[in-house]
Amino acid sequence: MVDLTPVIETMEHRWMRAWVNGDMRGLKAITAKNFILLTGSKPPVILDRASWIEGAAKRYLASSYRFADIYARGFGGIAIFSATLELKATMDGRDWSGLLFVTDVWRKRRIGGWKLVQRVVSKPDDTPHLAKAIKSLQLWKA
């Protein structure tokens, strides 16, 4: 089985750099036509591709980013990427910087290669006991 982690990480950085650099053409090139961005807010909100790209170009402006705690997994022509994302950004001139958790779904096309089809964005839960409690359910020891 091929490890898709380096391929998908590269695509993630291409996508984020396009946003940071205001390269909407580059962003469009690797964003699927049926892309959605789903926020883990209350209530959840969905943006389609056109809304996301318009917002990223004019209102929600990123200036830098850093991924950490990266997890990637491939399933043939589908790949999942999850990571914490430290983002410096503004929305309508107001600071929107912070730590996020993103889960992205990538699909490989015969023509055009890998395209981002979905991004789910939420705030990480830093409740101290949560990670420990979930980890205690693991049947293996890491």
Feature-to-residue mapping (PLM):
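A beta-strand edge to alpha-helix "cap/lid" segment located at domain peripheries
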Residues: 1-30, 36-142
